[in-house]
Amino acid sequence: MSPTFNASPNQLTLALSKGRIFTETLPLLEAAGIRVTEDPETSRKLILPTSDPAVRVVIVRASDVPTYVQYGAADFGVAGKDVLMESGMAGLYAPIDLNIARCRMSVAVPAGFDYANAVRQGARLAVATKYVQTAREHFAKKGVHVDLIKLYGSMELGPLVGLSDAIVDLVSTGSTLRANNLVEVEEIVQISSRLVVNQAALKLKRERLAPILDAFERASAALA
């Protein structure tokens, strides 16, 4: 018989994505006295145990974290503001800006492209992005005419092969933009990761969740 991985009523499930968010969440978990006992980069498991038998971590795509939390498959999770802006916050409580995985969402164009003049002239721009909803709202507020092209891979390739005039993407150091002869021309929003909590879990598991949320809040405040 296959083992079941359904959580017990008293168990807490935390949804995390691999990479920077996972790495930067580890010190916050440790501040709550919780240590993840397996490395998702080397383990093939998608459900990881922790030093607290009542807490487990599920590894999901970054864009899926809000969905797992919203539907109660996870009690809480860590998601970037970029993901939350795209997915909406239905069924979620986001009490804490964790001040981790900081970056910015920006508009970038090929070096030499006069973006400001194109906007002034009312040009219709093709923009490649995976943040379609956020980009649409941003350009609508500025009165810029755009055709949005949804991509999932490397945005920087769009202008290089003539697919788009510009991109909307996350920028940390800007080194990837520079390596592809792109320049940042407009910041849309500062991004960091948020703790999101299932609203039902917040009521039904408050006694278990509260100490963890408090520890996260104290630890993240030190990062601000």
Swiss-Prot record:
Pathway: Amino-acid biosynthesis; L-histidine biosynthesis; L-histidine from 5-phospho-alpha-D-ribose 1-diphosphate: step 1/9. The keyword Membrane does not apply. It is found in: Cytoplasm. GO terms for cellular component: cytoplasm. SUPFAM superfamilies: Periplasmic binding protein-like II. Its EC number is 2.4.2.17. It comes from the Bacteria. Its main location: cytoplasm. Coiled coil: none annotated. Disulfide bonds: none annotated. Lacks the C-terminal regulatory region which is replaced by HisZ. Heteromultimer composed of HisG and HisZ subunits. Belongs to the ATP phosphoribosyltransferase family. Short subfamily. Catalyzes the condensation of ATP and 5-phosphoribose 1-diphosphate to form N'-(5'-phosphoribosyl)-ATP (PR-ATP). Has a crucial role in the pathway because the rate of histidine biosynthesis seems to be controlled primarily by regulation of HisG enzymatic activity. This is ATP phosphoribosyltransferase. It comes from Cupriavidus necator (strain ATCC 17699 / DSM 428 / KCTC 22496 / NCIMB 10442 / H16 / Stanier 337).
